């Protein structure tokens, strides 16, 4: 009996002190591993933010041992709308090399798992401002010291080249993210492609392995630049299913997205932007723009 008890305790200690840490370190580590030059988990979180969090970005993490064979990952996300002054904090678990899913409630403020804003290009968001005299007057009534976060809806599904043309004609507008679609994704309503550079700089090694992923030059983008940025983020998650499991799509779907991206290209369903009332109003002059929905308005403290 004593031998059996000792054997059980030995197995438990082996799991707790050796096996679990080794498996968890395959998913999360603060150190650079395999000479890759970038932290695998953090890059994966940045990719998930770029694909599913149109109003925010990933800002960092740390791990804390929290129980038997379990670590808690403390994650920070940046809120581009300014609603959360001290950024957004959330947690997920890591046990025996399996990471838990992200908390959609904590991340809702930055657009994680949003639905309905661009459904069938009919619903651009709340507080709709339609193109035309009424919408123009509503935007004109806002003072120029306001900074708007707005959802832009189109008359039709756009190509990435058409999106790039609109961006080129409005250099003063901050284009945050495009609501996009490629076959293979589970829910087209929540899939996006960020149009801003990643908050964390991962260096040349990541750029060499996944060209365009960091979107270091995010001004004057071409349609191919946007497609390559999307391709790189999806490819990274396809290559790292252990991190991709934290997101809303099953890891195998990223491989399907890549195949369909090459065959059919990337479709643009809507757009998230920031700017002054005049800058947002100018978008209504675009022939392809159907409407603008003001999601958030804040006083701009800089010029």
Task: Give the ranges of each region predicted by the language model.
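Hydrophobic membrane-insertion alpha-helices, especially the h-region
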Residues: 2-18
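Loop-rich non-cytosolic ectodomains and luminal regions
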Residues: 16, 20-272, 290-303
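Short beta-strands and strand-coil junctions in structured, solvent-facing domains, enriched
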Residues: 159, 279-280
């Amino acid at each position: 009996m004593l031998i059996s008890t000792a054997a059980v305790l030995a197995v438990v200690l082996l799991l707790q002190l050796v096996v679990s840490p080794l498996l968890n370190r395959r998913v999360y580590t603060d150190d650079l591993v395999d000479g890759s030059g970038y932290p695998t988990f953090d890059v994966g979180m940045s990719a998930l933010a770029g694909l599913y969090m149109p109003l925010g970005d990933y800002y960092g993490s740390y791990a804390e041992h929290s129980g038997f064979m379990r670590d808690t990952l403390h994650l920070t996300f940046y809120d581009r709308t300014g609603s959360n002054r001290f950024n957004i904090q959330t947690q997920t678990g890591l046990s025996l090399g399996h990471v838990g899913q992200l908390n959609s409630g904590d991340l809702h403020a930055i657009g994680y798992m949003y639905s309905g804003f661009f459904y069938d290009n009919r619903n651009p968001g709340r507080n709709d401002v339609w193109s035309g005299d009424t919408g123009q007057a509503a935007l004109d009534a806002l003072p120029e010291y306001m900074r708007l976060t707005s959802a832009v809806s189109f008359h039709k599904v756009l190509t990435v080249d058409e999106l790039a043309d609109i961006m080129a004609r409005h250099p003063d507008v901050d284009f945050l993210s495009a609501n996009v679609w490629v076959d293979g994704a589970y829910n087209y309503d929540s899939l996006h492609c960020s149009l801003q550079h990643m908050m964390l700089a991962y260096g040349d090694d990541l750029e060499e392995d996944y060209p365009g992923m960091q979107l270091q030059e995010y001004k004057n983008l071409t349609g191919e630049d946007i497609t390559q940025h999307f391709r790189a983020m999806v490819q990274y998650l396809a290559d790292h299913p252990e991190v991709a499991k934290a997101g809303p799509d099953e890891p195998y779907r990223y491989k399907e997205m890549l195949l369909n991206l090459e065959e059919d290209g990337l479709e643009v369903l809507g757009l998230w932007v920031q700017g002054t009332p005049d800058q947002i109003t100018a978008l209504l002059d675009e022939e392809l723009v159907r409407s603008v929905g003001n999601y958030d308005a804040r006083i701009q403290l800089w010029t």
